[in-house]
Amino acid sequence: MKQTHNLAAVDLGASSGRVILARLDGEHLRLEEVHRFPNGPVRVADHMHWDVLRLFDEIKTGLCKAGQAAPLSSLGLDTWGVDFALLDRDDQLIGNPFHYRDPHTNGVFEKAFALVSRDEIFERTGIQFMQINSLFQLFVMRESAAVERARSFLMVPDLFNFWLTGRKANEYCNATTTQFYNPRIDGYDRELLAKLGLPNDIYPQIV
């Protein structure tokens, strides 16, 4: 008798999310959407945020549906890049993450490049310059109470993975969207972070 592996895939996009049940018997892969839900920014006080608590509730609902349909042996979760969450010393969420379309990073390049040149940042990180990149989001927040309290920095998908597993880590592909991952050293560029006045001790292992 063929052994069937049942896997759950959580796919979050900017406008919707879904949970897929995948059944693999060694010859065939069957996919079934077991849960779909809307996603989008929440506007609060002229800013746009992700409602990560509701999204996590939807993820759990979808995983329960998948688990009721078949015993799960593994799960995977993905979202967009650049956005992140900050946790305090007790691993409590410090506010809902900013949405990448929020205007709080408008004009950030001029301020950041006054401290570290565009050429140096590119030489260290090698990715496209966008004001939504995590480096610039964190830069505009650098004097905020949220950053002062922060003890952990997790990309959005890794926040959900932490809540599901209890393990803190930032997945490699998402870490490269921060613009403070340095491929030359295969890790966070702590010297770049220091030059920009950003914390350099709140980032978990890259996996």
Segments (PLM) and residue ranges:
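Hydrophobic or amphipathic alpha-helical targeting/insertion segments
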Residues: 89-93, 111, 115-116, 120
